């Protein structure tokens, strides 16, 4: 019998990616202050710690026997981590910094059920066009930049600023499905069985 599946996330994009399969799940927003974890220079360790803490919070919210999926995604440019912008001005500054260059998008997934905890990370390289300065504010207002690490999105018209992607596009949306499926298979679940 398959475990109840819980996506521990408030991200609409993560939810939408998982909804593209027929796998039954519920979405629970973990009540966790991400600012409580300090970035120490290793984005893989940082995202793993954040995702692990989110999973533990979800487990403590009455889902102790469920299979819990959590994730954390960051943009990394020249060693600096870009999380979700704090304001429109902050989002514009992030995009200005990333304009015309390449950066990494790193997501770490944590799957937790009872005492079994697995994690894996995905790294995608993204290159931006030289974004015309006069379009930065319009972009930020058009694509809910405050809800997205790095202040941008890849879906819909958000991809207008993207020149090239090397790696998993779903990673940029916060839920790399190939990596997720590999971890789910360790719990005897395969996304292949839930294709629409």
Curated annotation (Swiss-Prot):
Record's subcellular location: Cytoplasm
Residues at the site labelled Important for substrate specificity: 13, 73, 155
Pfam families assigned to the protein according to its UniProt record, in alphabetical order: Maf
Biological-process GO terms, alphabetical: nucleotide metabolic process
Enzyme Commission number(s): 3.6.1.9
Keyword terms: Cytoplasm, Hydrolase, Nucleotide metabolism
GO CC terms of this entry: cytoplasm
Cofactor(s) needed by this chain: a divalent metal cation
Residue numbers annotated as active site: 72
One term of GO molecular function: dTTP diphosphatase activity
Catalytic activity: dTTP + H2O = dTMP + diphosphate + H(+); UTP + H2O = UMP + diphosphate + H(+)
Function: Nucleoside triphosphate pyrophosphatase that hydrolyzes dTTP and UTP. May have a dual role in cell division arrest and in preventing the incorporation of modified nucleotides into cellular nucleic acids.
Family: Belongs to the Maf family. YhdE subfamily.
Official protein name in the record: dTTP/UTP pyrophosphatase
Organism: Chlamydia trachomatis serovar L2 (strain ATCC VR-902B / DSM 19102 / 434/Bu)
